[in-house]
Amino acid sequence: MQQIVILGGGAAGLAAALAAAQSAPAGAVRVTVLDRNPRCGKKLLATGNGRCNLDNTGIAPEQYFTADPAALRPLLAAVDAAAPLEWFAALGLYTRTDEAGRVYPYSNQAADVLALLEGHLTRLGVEVRTGCTVQT
């Protein structure tokens, strides 16, 4: 059995753990998330003033502070902007987009996003250990 350890239980760490667990056949991989905090997702709960700003549909190179906005165009064009929202939809999360293009969970509650991620991690057998420090 292959073992995958994810360091950090923030939004990216939880998403990585979920993706790793989903991509392997059942029983082929053991995924563990290690986080130094007493609970995972602390910053996720604070994002978007507690509403969890998931995405922005109006991203353009001109919105970034850079000497050469044109250099960002091919980078942004290479990103599948719909993929994150499709991923959340596949997990069962309903979203809404406000007039400024910001995407939030339909409930407007970051806690619902965290609960959804944690529920899928539990269902897939991902072990989450909090209060851990990792030394190299």
Predicted regions and their residues:
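Conserved beta-strand segments of alpha/beta enzyme cores
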Residues: 30, 94, 125-127
